[in-house]
Amino acid sequence: MKKNLIKKCAVAAAACAVMAAGVGYYYFFSSMSKDGETHYVYVDDDDNIDSVYTKLSDVSASHSLAAFKLLTNATSYASHVRTGRYAIEPSTGALQTFRHMRNGQQTPVNLTVPSVRTLDKLAELSKRLMVDSADIAKALTSEATCEKYGYDTATIACMFIPNTYDIYWNTSVERLLDRMQKESKRFWEGDRTVKAQQMKLT
């Protein structure tokens, strides 16, 4: 009798463990995307945890959002919200999404520099970034800023090589210009004549 009772208790405990594991998997590891599609959540520098929840609720399954909130309550994320563009993918659960957002592991955007590089066109790059177009325009018309990169306000547009770049959505104006300077130097290494022909400068 006693052995049977122990056996039944062991079976019940095992069943409970399996159920708990199943529930845990469902909440923390099953797809967070509410419709099986990839979505992006943009966290601005004026967002707080409540606005993050609101943005997540538009693209997340309810059980995954509940799990995300549990993880938030168990950590200090609410007071350390990090800006960025975060992917909510079909293969990503609440736990992985939470880790990405807590650690600032965002998904870059494809930023295309047009072949027509007027200052107004370059300021429009802000449409793909968190920065404001006025901030980009201010930097490109600043003699001090242009001089820092070896240009003046009339030639700074030449630093922007037409191409598509992977860049983080929350990149600052300074980091954007640093990246463009790096890409420009890389482009012009080697045969300058060939590169100039590619750019239709000769």
Which role does the model predict for each range below?
Residues 1-202:
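Conserved catalytic or metal-liganding residues and their short signature motifs at active sites
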